UniProtKB/Swiss-Prot annotation:
GO terms for molecular function: scavenger receptor activity. The gene is SNMP-1. InterPro entries: CD36_fam. Residues 1-11, 480-523 are cytoplasmic. One of its GO terms (biological process) is sensory perception of smell. It comes from the Eukaryota. The keyword Disulfide bond applies. Residues 33-458 are extracellular. It comes from Helicoverpa armigera. This is Sensory neuron membrane protein 1.
Amino acid sequence: MQLPRELKYAAIAGGVALFGLIFGWVLFPTILKSQLKKEMALSKKTDVRKMWEKIPFALDFKVYIFNFTNAEEVQKGATPILKEIGPYHFDEWKEKVEVEDHEEDDTITYKKRDVFYFNPEMSAPGLTGEEIVVIPHIFMLGMALTVARDKPAMLNMVGKAMNGIFDDPPDIFLRVKALDILFRGMIINCARTEFAPKATCTALKKEGVSGLVLEPNNQFRFSIFGTRNNTIDPHVITVKRGITSVMDVGQVVAVDGKTEQTIWRDTCNEFQGTDGTVFPPFVPETERIESFSTDLCRTFKPWYQKKTSYRGIKTNRYIANIGDFANDPELNCYCAKPDTCPPKGLMDLAPCMKAPMYASMPHFLDSDPALLSKVKGLNPDVTQHGIEIDYEPITGTPMVAKQRIQFNIQLLKTDKLDLFKDLSGDIVPLFWIDEGLALNKTFVNMLKHQLFIPKRVVGVLRWWMVSFGSLGAVIGIVFHFRDHIMRLAVSGDTKVSKVTPEEEEQKDISVIGQAQEPAKVNI
């Protein structure tokens, strides 16, 4: 039996609508997820792997230094008055070197290398890096704080050593060019032959102090970031490639061959999260994105804040802070003991960096108000000083990231050292950094063409197919049954009587009605 033409058209249109439903809402999402799982894994064939190994554009690395405008008064115990100088802008190029794949457990090992170039044009107006800044002497304070914590009986000898190494300093402050303390380095004189300076310098060589580089003639050069510049980091990091399971991509599983740290307590020693340069796809808003910082030896777990967009791509914004170790059970294990945590918003970096420093949010944002009251000149603002990531949830791509951390030090107060006996003992800021990532137009367009344009086309096409297919099916069915529908419509409004031929012959006009008498008209 051959179908009527109208039903054929209806069947074809219905098939189009059904295909739109199946392809648009079932097949395409499945194909997309399958393809993304392949593309987002760190296999040698993917673009993600190439970009993960060497970011093809520079990150923004900004440094803000706190200049102590009343150093002489602070030496006598006064409240520091600070003036922020910056940003000093550096172009930061990141790459991973000595990369090795391990097929047996789906991991990669690598080391990091960062290269910094000073960019005066992007720095604050007038800053050249040659400005003299006045800050607490990081190296001198570091020596005193470390000995006071670990070997307090040795403080007297350290005092003599500092007088020899630093030529009888008048106070605990450093007056130095900005670029010297940041990258170029300042000379630490270890050529003295007296016992105390010589013994101290020998210990420095043996322990390998962070930021210290041995120079000829028994000299050291000290800077904050100089040892990182164009230097291969000695730590070997192991992460998951995500080929077996894309949700594990970038997950840190070991550092220097060890699957756990030994510097904290309990679960804080675990490696949780990715290495911060790649994240898994398909992460819902209800879940946190986790990354492990090898610089700070801890995991950060930003939480969802709001919907955002970047260059036409919808993103989710996640934010984070240092945390409150005393009152957050998940973070308490970062304290040496449960009841000896630093104030809210501070993290003791000594176990990680081997230097007596504290990390916080810039300007003590989200920190104990008491910290802010100990200094003048700080103005915390979440827009300028917060940590945030604009994250594309389908691919797991960080579109915009702003990592902001402030480094602080304690003005040690002790009667065993003349230079330290009148200090306040408070924790004060030294500088803060703003490391920023923003995908440029080239990579945003690449992401759009590979993912979002096809996704939008399919999104429009599926609705077109369902809408017009359904409409075509309805029209075809209506046309096929139009005569029957019309008869039904007529029968509902008109009564029809069946008349036989015999009845027709017997009918006359009277059946219809009797004749009426003409109306009379009076003339």
